[in-house]
Amino acid sequence: MGRLSKKIRPTESNLSKIPNQSGVYLLYRGKKPPYVGKAGPGRLQKRIRQQLNTRRGITTIRYKPTRSEREAGVWEKKYRNKYNPTQKRI
């Protein structure tokens, strides 16, 4: 699959364009390291929406669709180690 998306704002218009498949996502709150998460098959858009409902202050989102939940887990680990190696949460 491709690269991470460009940073997008969490607007309804942008969220509706996120595909319904497995993937990894990064949620940014200002300049803090991003929250890194993954979504199983058919759940990328839904999972991002769920996170936005529970996490306040998210300003931008990036995501990467994957072919499987396993692949999403591999990318989640890679991005977590890159952006926030000591913890997962922002």
Language-model segment annotations:
Residues 81:
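Active-site-proximal loop/helix of nucleotide/amide-processing enzymes and allied scaffolds
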Residues 84-90:
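Coupling/hinge elements of helicase-like and P-loop NTPase modules
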Residues 1-53, 59, 66-78:
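GIY-YIG nuclease catalytic motif and its immediate N-terminal context
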